[in-house]
Structure formats: structure tokens, C-alpha cells
Amino acid sequence: MTATLERRESASLWSRFCDWITSTDNRLYIGWFGVLMIPLLLTATSVFIIAFIAAPPVDIDGIREPVSGSLLYGNNIISGAIVPTSAAIGLHFYPIWEAASLDEWLYNGGPYEMIVLHFLLGVCCYMGREWELSFRLGMRPWIAVAYSAPVAAATAVFLIYPIGQGSFSDGMPLGISGTFNFMIVFQAEHNILMHPFHMLGVAGVFGGSLFSAMHGSLVTSSLIRETTENESANAGYKFGQEEETYNIVAAHGYFGRLIFQYASFNNSRALHFFLAAWPVIGIWFTALGISTMAFNLNGFNFNQSVVDSQGRVINTWADIINRANLGMEVMHERNAHNFPLDLASVEAPSVNG
């Protein structure tokens, strides 16, 4: 009888724990994805802060030339970064216990792999937590779908690209200048600016910014005033009110006259779907572009594609970009190889016709 009561008590305790985890009455929703997300993101954040402040230099290229990334080793906020795991490690799983010592683990850039893997799993759990909370509240699942765009982008630069290139040392450094270096080298090796998927991403980001500004300014300019001229129009709004807070007909009329009638949405649902879908689809395409360029399916190459009747090259902007790419290619990792890949396999292309 005692054993039976004990089992009931433990089951009741577990049941209360489950109810607390999945309760939507908590100030911050936890959820089952949150049970995984919280320790993963705390680990990634803690290791990032410690390594950014105090990690010793990392032999990123595997040639015994360590690169400093932390504040205590001479960097500032702009130049500092978590330096990617060494090329000597490649794609091997490199936890602390796989190294002979902590010094070796730090020298080979172990913190980068630790941060990236915990971070990627953590943001995937955050996306799952968004879906889980939407499900509990009876909402539709599109918040998590929208968040999948930045998750896909992060996964592309931190995981898919290193897999395609064969080493975590090719992943994006976790710092400002390191990110710029990653972008420049990526352009040199893959001609990303000439890749149509990157162009779609640019249209998504800049177009999304434009549409967000247009929508916010139109709504703010067509608020229904419930107050006098002597107090803020915002004071006339009550959270949860049934009445609409702005006049969509007025906003539609304004924008329809500013551009033309059919350039303006007259359906709020269609408008907000468009505002969400435009940047999300653009960033999806950019992530897909990074993931294909990871395996060296690169941007368009129009070098020396225009010639005169005598066969002489007439330079275009594509040739100017190619010249810049060659310059960036020969300057990066200049001690890691005798010749850049573009120049070592065949005769260098002419850049002046």
C-alpha cells in the first residue's frame, strides 16, 4: 500500500511539472523546446563571453601561425572575434575531452565549435518553442515559419558552408571584422555578388525595410483620433479595444493616389502576408545560395564575354569584379598555400585584354 501511494505521489509531481512547463500563464513560456533551448543558449552565450574576453590565439589555418581574437590579447570590440576552429581539426567533432589538454583545445579553436553547435541547436529549439506556444494558444504556425529564415541563414554560414569546404576553419568568425573578412573571402572564392539567390536576398532585405517603413508610416499617419488636440493621439488607444485603431481606407486612398490604385493593398490580411513573405523568401534564397556555393556551385562568370570583331576583349563590369576577386584571393591566407586555387590550376586569365 505504501509503495502504491509513493508511485501516485511521484506521478502527481511529474504531472505538476509537465503542467508548469507547458503552462501559458507563466510570465515567460518555457515549453518542452524551452527545456532544451535554455541550457543550450546559456552554454553558447557563456562560452562566447569568456572566449571573447580571454581566449588565447588560435591556429586557424593549421600552419602554426595563431590568430588573436580576444580582448585580453590586444583586440577591441571591432577587431575581436571568436576565431574558428583550426583547419588541423577539419570537420572532426572536437569537444574538450578529445584534446590532450585545455591549452591544446584552446589553441585549436575548440570554443568556436562548441559555441556554434550549441547556438544552432538553441535557435532551432527557439523556433520550435515559437510553434509550441502558438499551438497552445490556438494560433496559426506562421511565426515559427518566418523565424526559419534567419535560422536557415545561420545554419548556412556556420554549418553547411564548413561541411562543403571540409573544415570548420572556413566558417564565419564570431566578430565584426571577422564577419567582414568572411564576406570578402566568400566573394573572392565564390563570386557571391553575381549569384541570383544572393540578389534575391538583397531584394528581400532592402525591400522588407522599405515596406516596413511604408507600412508603419502609413498606419501612424492614419490613426483614428480619440483625443483632443492637447493630448497625444496614443492616449486614445486601449489595449484590447474592439474598435479599429487606424483607418485602412484612408491609408489605401492615400497610397493609391500617391502611386496608383492597384499598388495599394485594400485587404489587411493580404498586406500583412506580403510584409512577412517578402523578406522571409528572400533570406531563404540567400541561405540556399550559401549552401550551394558551399559545394562550389558559384555565381555567374561573365569574364571576358564581350569581344570585338578581332577577338580582343572589351572589358565589362564583370571583368572589373573578376580583377577585384583575384586581388582578394591572392591576399587572404597568404602563408597557408603557395598559390591561390584560382591561379594554381591553369594559366591566369588576362585582366587587361
Swiss-Prot record:
Protein name as annotated: Photosystem II protein D1
Other comment: 2 of the reaction center chlorophylls (ChlD1 and ChlD2) are entirely coordinated by water.
Annotated positions binding a quinone: 215, 264-265
Binding site for pheophytin a: 126
GO BP: any one term: response to herbicide
InterPro entries: D1/D2, Photo_II_D1/D2_sf, Photo_RC_L/M, Photo_RC_L/M_CS, PSII_D1
Residues given in the record as Fe cation binding sites: 215, 272
Main location: plastid
Function field: Photosystem II (PSII) is a light-driven water:plastoquinone oxidoreductase that uses light energy to abstract electrons from H(2)O, generating O(2) and a proton gradient subsequently used for ATP formation. It consists of a core antenna complex that captures photons, and an electron transfer chain that converts photonic excitation into a charge separation. The D1/D2 (PsbA/PsbD) reaction center heterodimer binds P680, the primary electron donor of PSII as well as several subsequent electron acceptors.
HAMAP family, A to Z: PSII_PsbA_D1 (MF_01379)
Species of the source: Chlorokybus atmophyticus
GO cellular component terms listed in the entry, alphabetical order: chloroplast thylakoid membrane; photosystem II
Propeptide: 345-353
Site (Cleavage): 344-345
Site positions per UniProt: Stabilizes free radical intermediate: 190
Residues that, per the record, bind [CaMn4O5] cluster: 170, 189, 332-333, 342, 344
Residues recorded with modification Phosphothreonine: 2
